[in-house]
């Protein structure tokens, strides 16, 4: 199916399989993301080491990311996604027979090589078929599906535990759920085309604000998923409660993503982006002031999760708006890689800040980047609106 023919069908119907796959990806991620940080924390490794190990996923994705559009163009969207999912299944099993930061750093790197494939290809799929007037809401539904899966992940950990082989084997089994909705569309998924006249540098400069949103949003989300459970333990609650904080963080996305997506379709997306970034800055700034055992921390984490999560889909909508006549495949890949780069820089930076300043190091690091994005978006909005 070509992009034009895909677009002629109902965009929502065309996107159903990728939405379902993204929900499964979110579920698997919600189970997997806390495992390595909590295991290394239990073994006594410092937070800088934890940040470096978890950052190797991003290194793997960056090392392989530029090849994803070409592979999807040559072999098809669904085949490359399914092969990557099964490779990830084997890597999850390998965690159960290894231990320590060196072995897990290598496995996390390999996971990054294959883990970025279904994510990047699914976003190219969406931006290929979506209508401009619905772009914000489509990206909101995408965010809700991923977040819904992620919110269930820590609940799964309450059943299987956060330590030992059981949670990793659970992740391996959940990989199969990603492939199931894609297989019927092996030959009918939208065809991904590559513009031979463009390159990654040129597509970045087509939408610099969107790319900055990817960086800041990626830094915030990946730092939260790596360090929010660790922050919670340091603040005086159990590891299981810390994992549930992640559920609350992601639940905010489910609650707030659709109204923010609606705003992105009806108001200037640069203004919406600025609002999300600046409110997120305030929320992470007050988090250390909220007692970890009070109900107020739930509300703070919920709002922070929902509003900060919106930075990514609003940025993705800005991207599609800016490069709709250009190379959307390369632009989407660059967007995802810059998102990963944000986490690659932010995780060790936040780990070091938390080693130096304890729990306030988390909010201070994130507030700095949220502030930079918010002010930049405001300046661009005011300048282009003048």
Residue ranges and their predicted role:
Residues 9-58, 221-231, 235, 242:
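Helix-loop boundary and gating motifs at the non-cytosolic
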Residues 64-76, 161, 256-268, 354-355:
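Helix-to-loop junctions at the C-terminal end of transmembrane segments
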Residues 79-93, 271-285, 367:
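Structural signature of the two symmetry-related core transmembrane helices
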Residues 117-130, 309-323:
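Intracellular juxtamembrane helix-capping segments at the cytosolic ends
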Residues 172-192, 376-380:
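C-terminal membrane-cytosol helix-exit motif in multi-pass small-molecule transporters
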Residues 326-356:
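A late C-terminal transmembrane helix in Major Facilitator Superfamily
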